[in-house]
A protein has these predicted regions:
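Short Pro/Gly-enriched beta-strand edge/turn motifs at strand-loop
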Residues: 65-71
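Conserved lysine of the Walker
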Residues: 104
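Post-Walker A alpha-helix
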Residues: 107-108
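Conserved AdoMet
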Residues: 60-62
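Interdomain "pre-motor" coupling segment immediately N-terminal to P-loop NTPase/helicase cores
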Residues: 31-47
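Glycine-rich, often acidic-flanked micro-motifs
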Residues: 3-23, 35, 43, 56, ...
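Phosphate-centric recognition/catalysis
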Residues: 49-55
Length: 188
């Protein structure tokens, strides 16, 4: 079945062979004509299966591979799916970035405990970033919310990116463009 989902203003046709993950696309479904379309065929799923944990279902592999393909078709539209936990604080998005298992969700939960209703989750795993012509970046939801299922259909301008790494002590410091570029590119 082919559905059309809105990714930061770009309608993309998404081919779903399995109904089990369709619910994640519902908040972004649109009747607009797709600007691009993606599908993960059976041969593609078989090739990709080795990159996923043993026992991963074909439906799960399709769902995750669709993420990569959607990101690829969004690039010409100045948008990309980005790996990070995005939440809104004081009107701007804080994007927590780190390899899987580092503690992005844990860090978000701590912010939520400290700031309560000032914090709104946007997407817990893979938001869409839109680099506007004017130079600012806005952050938008995607169907890929992560294993915790955190996300809602809201968007806001990017306020900052926090790179996390495990350490014995909590510290924060500003990093320069040279160091941050390498870290950023691993998040796409």
């Amino acid at each position: 079945m082919m559905i059309t989902a809105d990714f930061a203003g770009v309608p993309v046709g998404v081919g779903l062979s399995y109904d089990s993950y369709r619910k994640f696309f519902e908040a972004q479904q649109t009747e607009a004509a797709p600007a691009a379309s993606v599908i993960v065929g059976e041969a593609d799923r078989r090739r990709a299966a080795g990159f996923y944990p043993a026992g991963s279902t074909d439906a799960y592999i399709e769902y995750m591979e669709l993420c990569r393909r959607v990101s690829d078709v969004l690039i010409p539209f100045r948008r990309a799916v980005f790996h990070g936990c995005a939440f809104i604080w004081r009107g701007r998005v804080v994007l927590l970035c780190a390899p899987s298992g580092t503690g992005k969700t844990t860090h978000y939960v701590r912010w939520k405990q400290l700031f309560g209703d000032e914090i709104q989750i946007l997407n817990g795993d893979k938001p869409v970033l839109f680099a506007r012509q004017e130079g600012d970046i806005t952050v938008h939801p995607s169907p890929w919310h992560g294993k915790e299922g955190m996300g809602q259909p809201i968007s806001a301008p990017l306020g900052g990116i926090v790179f996390l790494r495990k350490a014995a002590e909590n510290t924060i410091r500003r990093v320069g463009a040279e160091l941050s570029a390498g870290i950023l590119f691993r998040q796409f």
